[in-house]
Amino acid sequence: MKQHIAIIIALCMVACNTNKSTDALLVEVWNNDQSAREQMVELTRAVTIEGRTDLIDSLIAGVEAVEKVDIKNISIIDSLLRDGLPENLTPQSYKTIWIVIDHASLDKQEQYLPLIEEMSQNGLIGKDEHAILYDRIAMKRNCPQRYGSQTVQFGKPDAMNLYVYPVENPALLDSLRASVGMSSMEEYLKQLTKTTGIEAKYDAELTIEQLEAMRGIFK
């Protein structure tokens, strides 16, 4: 009996150590993801809002750096999820798994969308995080999004535009957003405008074709 108890305790200690190791790895993954993006956002703002054309090469390098980080991070998540979703990780670790998938290529996003939905249903991540991934996939497929979380930015440095990507059911948009814990579209637009420094716009009647035509003018 004592031997059995000792074995159980030993196994628990191994599991705890494994979880701590995984959590530590995912902290590093999160930091790499955020650090690369923060630098790119600062450069993007400088070029597009402040007109710092002298930083264009730095911005291009920043975009490439983000892409490299994303590729490395999703390979780590692939390995981590090979035998299924680890249990008993910290909330931040589960959020990191989501954000790496959210920043991955379309095929990886589609591959893991069912897992992300399951994680949100089980309370490991927020329902809004599943909604964001769902919308991102829809936009990449050139389809209307459901929750209005995705935006597109285009224009010239002194005249940038920021539009919410078209949604599939404008009449139900705010109720759909509320169902996953998102703010109203009105509040979201205020938040976007404050964060980006660009007036965020939402046109319920705007189609994908019309939006692409608007973007094409600046290409």
For each feature predicted by the language model, list its residue ranges.
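Sec-dependent signal peptide recognition
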Residues: 2-8
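Generic N-terminal initiation segments characterized by hydrophobic and/or small/turn-forming residues
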Residues: 8-10, 22-23
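C-terminal motif of bacterial Sec signal peptides marking the signal peptidase cleavage site
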Residues: 12-15
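Short beta-strand and adjacent turn/loop elements
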Residues: 69-74, 78-219
